[in-house]
């Protein structure tokens, strides 16, 4: 309600819209299908549904989420604001800091020539986020700008893989939240979109 009121009371805002979409839409924690997962029990312990409406299936809840998300985005646009949509950040299924520490602790020789890079399947990312991409991509408006975090981490330094670190930086704070270094990369992309908006406004 506070956010809605703020958007009503102010004009020509640039709104950055991002959240972890996958877990709410799929109701499962992340499994990288290579031996690492977010939780031992992958089933999400709660789900989203409209107030005073009891849903009976995941498909029904997904439809409500889709309708609600599209409605909220259109509401922001129709109030005259510009919107930067930030798509799903790749999930890793483990804490890369702990992973690298354990690697170093048990086998320091691995670090003699280079730093091991932890990565996950880009295909797994695409499959898991297919629905949210379809929903966000279906909303077309010249006032919408888009940022794709996966283009920073996936299919870049390693083909068909999403990386959690490189030789110099660890991009994740834990299994799915970006570190300061990782966040800076995404924020730089957001700022590029904001600059485009400001150039058009002048």
Where are these regions (language model features)?
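Extracellular glycan-modifying ectodomains
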Residues: 1-202
